[in-house]
């Protein structure tokens, strides 16, 4: 994971992006923001009450006047600008202007995503404090998904010198065949941004139809659907993870370009994805980067509950990197 992050960090040091850390009073978010600044990765902006942030800076052993930018909804001009932005977006879905003002004033995720949407910051990292689904709901009020993409979570696993991308680890409970296809196509876009040649395996507890169960039907349908798309990458499935990753299975399945070579694993459902990455982290000693929020129309990342400062820092770096390498306007 270090090589990937080193490459990203080298890149963002040059561009010095402005990154919002939404829960500026949270100890772990604050530590990550301070590390972001001290490592010269970019310019952190904290959302929080100034006196509370200063208190927290003292609590983590820094001078309360440590030079870091703090913003809050006391900034009247911004507040009016963000309320207007939100109201324009939501007036047709029954939101009143005063409700938009209330959201902008009281919700840091809303304020932070408005900062990015209005160009007052380049990227944002949020979370570590709230439930993931609630945060996504708030984000999607301000930010649309990318045209033709769905929003999902992608986690990078780095183990024994190999990097594997796992999707969807965070958002869609039971993806349909069509959603699995969208997740696969978006995952290859991301893998290429990180410099990988995508090789996609659709995972299951069965390999090429044995044993066939009701649980594997949508995965097989996804493969059939993939054949109707004009894609420029190799994919195959359904298959078990060992078949996807272990080269010694190549001779058993000589007809497949993916067996033993996969670097993108499309999971059949959220529970299997989530269990897999947590097991790998805890028991398999894999390094995790992410989950990255894919398909959102702005460079915003959500840190899961119990994220360490270094995990939050990685997400901040990736958000800054995304704001540089992804064209969000198109």
Where are these regions (language model features)?
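Anion-binding alpha/beta catalytic cores of soluble intermediary-metabolism enzymes, centered on
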Residues: 1-330
């Amino acid at each position: 994971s270090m090589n990937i992050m080193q490459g990203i960090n080298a890149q963002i040091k040059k561009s010095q992006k402005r990154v919002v850390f939404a829960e500026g009073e949270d100890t772990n978010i604050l530590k990550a923001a301070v590390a972001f600044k001290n490592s010269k990765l970019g310019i952190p902006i904290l959302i929080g009450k100034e006196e509370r942030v200063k208190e927290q800076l003292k609590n983590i052993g820094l001078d309360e006047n440590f030079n870091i930018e703090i913003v809050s909804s006391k900034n009247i001009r911004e507040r009016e600008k963000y309320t207007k932005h939100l109201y324009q977006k939501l007036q047709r879905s029954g939101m009143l202007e005063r409700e938009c003002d209330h959201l902008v004033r009281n919700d840091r995720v809303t304020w932070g995503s408005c900062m990015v949407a209005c160009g007052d910051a380049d990227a944002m990292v949020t979370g570590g404090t709230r439930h993931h689904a609630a945060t996504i709901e708030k984000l999607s009020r301000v930010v649309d998904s990318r045209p033709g993409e769905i929003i999902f979570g992608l986690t990078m696993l780095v183990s024994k010198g190999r990097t594997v991308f796992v999707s969807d680890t965070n958002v869609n409970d039971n993806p349909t065949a069509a959603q699995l296809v969208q997740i696969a196509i978006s995952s290859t876009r991301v893998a290429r941004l990180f410099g990988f040649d995508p090789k996609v395996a659709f995972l299951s507890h069965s390999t090429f139809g044995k044993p066939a169960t009701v649980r594997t039907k949508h995965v097989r349908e996804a493969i059939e659907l993939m054949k109707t798309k004009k894609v420029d990458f190799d994919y195959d499935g359904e298959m078990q993870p060992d078949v996807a990753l272990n080269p010694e299975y190549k001779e058993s399945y000589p007809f497949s370009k993916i067996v033993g070579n996969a670097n993108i694993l499309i999971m059949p459902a959220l529970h299997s994805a989530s269990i897999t990455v947590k097991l790998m982290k805890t028991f398999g000693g894999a390094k995790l980067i992410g989950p990255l929020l894919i398909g959102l129309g702005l460079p915003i990342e959500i840190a899961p509950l119990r994220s360490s400062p270094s995990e939050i820092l990685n997400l901040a770096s990736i958000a800054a990197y995304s704001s540089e390498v992804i064209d969000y306007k198109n």
